[in-house]
Amino acid sequence: MPSAQTTSRCCPSFIRNLMEQSWPVLRGGLFQLEAETAHQVTLRGLKIAKRLGMLGWLPPLAEAAPLTVAGLRFPNRVGLAAGLDKAGECVDGFGAMGFGHVEIGTLTPRAQPGNPRPRLFRLVEQEAIINRMGFNNPGIIEGRANASDRTFPGILGVNIGKNFDTPNEKAAEDYLLGLRGAWDWADYVTVNLSSPNTKGLRDLQQEESCRALIRTLHAEQKVLAQQHQRHVPVFIKISPDLEPDHRQGLARLFVIEKLEGVIATNTTLSRENTEGARHSTEAGGLSGAPLREKATAFVASLAKELDGALPIIGAGGIMSGSDAAAKLQAGAALVQLYTGFIYRGPALVRECVESCAVQAEAT
């Protein structure tokens, strides 16, 4: 008969296995709901689980091929991409799934409702999502308050953007407000220039605009680092739809300006591999399995162009452990999950952590 101590050690693993195995049933119920409603129900469930102390039933965050990126020690290679926890309400809930880092947002200086609903669509047979959310979020101040009680021991990223009614000529002011608002509680900040759902936002990826913004943010970094006696790395998230010469130009720019990291990629406007699917003609950014090959090829090309000068966080179409390992093989240092997590649940996190650890040890 096992001792109480043995039972105590086994319980967290048992609960995790039960959670992973029950996900298909839970997903079946959630997928009966409208996509955004299902998302809200999931977030509410995670908040209730935290309030009831149920997150403590799960195993503590384990290290697997830990890596230092931009001066931050990531306990494993797998993170949650921005977009699932826009308001920073469920950092501990998602962290309990085994993510080594959690990125919240996109947060803008002022709260905004985003685009009209419906704005989130499942392409179930293709294991894909189309969203045109439009940076719906409570604003950087509320995001800070929401995340203030977290106990998650991993890395916290804060994804920042501009408000929809801020013209591009004044976008830098919004990003400065976001950087200042996140500085004392974020481990890193991601500058989102690549969402297709805010009019004109992707224009900020043009080389001259991007150069000016990076220089403005880097100057502010120095001021904030001196004021707070801590450094917060700044990454930029870019689109998979960049033409090769545009991507190459940005890679040169990132190296010259000493950017600390790049997230590749955001969602795509392409509808390749979704032809004829229900909802495939909806406006918005496509994520999930149809983006997998495009995103991995993008990471591989970008890695060659950066030549190790700065780290890449690979995202886009990771639906299995082998997909995550392929991103590392292509040149990413870390990976992030979004749509794959919606379709496969917590089991995908563990699978990706294990596959990435094997891939990291082999290289």
Where are these regions (language model features)?
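Glycine/Thr-rich beta-alpha phosphate-binding loop at enzyme active sites
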Residues: 47-49, 54-61, 196-209, 252-308, ...
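Short beta-strand/loop segments at the ligand-binding rim of alpha/beta enzyme cores
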Residues: 72-79, 153-158, 224-242, 305-314
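Glycine-rich phosphate-binding active-site loops on the catalytic face of alpha/beta enzymes
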Residues: 103-112, 193-195, 261-269, 318, ...
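A gly/proline- and charged-residue-enriched helix-loop-helix capping module
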Residues: 105-154
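Catalytic cores of alpha/beta
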Residues: 87-94, 242-254, 308, 318-335
